[in-house]
Every structure is written in structure tokens, then in C-alpha cells.
Amino acid sequence: SGPDIVTHHTCLYPMAGQTISASRAVEVFMAAGVPAEKLVLGAAFYGRGWSGLDSSRHPVGQTGKPGVSFRYPACAKAIAEGSQKRCWDDEAKAPYLWDGDTFVGYDDPESLYHKVSFVVSRDLAGIMFWEWSQDEDNELLTAIYETYQGHRFPR
């Protein structure tokens, strides 16, 4: 998929017909001999997306105009104000915003729960994120911390 093809930004698992995902990257590195304790999974504290999409079709897989970017607080605000609808892709374990024209993939507390659980279950070194300043209320950092509670940290 090229830069104009709509796909999830940082999905944990691939959707049907897709091959790119965080879990797949971990599998590839481990198959190449990289030890789990050397791998860190990534998360995004911002959203990335496309505009100019067809509202009659599911957004993922469409061709659109890339370049849409939201800080995490803007994602939450758009949902609260009703200008964007939060959707959940249960296969990819990824949220996205969708208004019929614009798709924005991002991470939220629910997707981070699944990512941290994956990190713990695979004994990975941990999780990283970009960019902390885009989590103004520490909602995402708190979700990561709270999910780790009760789990031991990898070596």
C-alpha cells in the first residue's frame, strides 16, 4: 500500500487482506533472531489520516489525500463535539475517526490496553510512544501505566 492508500496508523494486528501491523513486525524480527527482550512496541500519541474519501464505502483501503494530522486531544475533542465519529476495528485492535470524508487512525486507551497486554504476553522490552507533549492530560500515559499494573516488567 502506498502513501495514498488509507490504512490504520499503528494497528496491533492486521486487518483482513493487510500484512502490515505491529504484531507482524515483532514476528518478523523474532523470526530473524532478535530476542524479545530487545524489542520495543510503538504507540502514537497523535492521529494520522486521509481526506477526500467515499462515505458509502469503508475507509480502509480507499485512495485518499494524505496529510491529515490530529494531536490526541484534538481526536478526543472531535469525538466529544460530534464532528468525528470514533470507530473501532476489532480485528486490528485500532480506533479511528470517521466523518464520511476524513479518516484518522490513532491510539487511545483501549488500543493501548491491547498493545501493553501484547508486550507483556510476549515478554518484550516495553512500549514507546511519540510524542508525549501530544498527550496533554496524560490520559494515554496513564492508560499504559495502569495496564502494566499487576504485570511484571520484562527483563
Q: How would you describe each model-predicted region?
A:
Residues 18-26, 108, 112-115, 140, ...:
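Stable alpha-helical elements in mature extracytoplasmic
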Residues 43, 131-133:
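Active-site proximal loops enriched in glycine and acidic residues that flank catalytic Cys/His/Asp
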Residues 66-123:
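Hydrophobic, secondary-structure "cap" segments at the distal end of domains
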Residues 77, 81, 118, 133-155:
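Aromatic-rich peripheral "rim/lid" segments of glycoside hydrolase catalytic domains that contact
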Residues 41, 119, 127:
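Conserved, mostly hydrophobic/aromatic
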Residues 25-35, 115-122, 147-150:
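Structured segments of extracytoplasmic/periplasmic soluble domains
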Residues 13-16, 100-107, 128-129:
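Active-site rim elements
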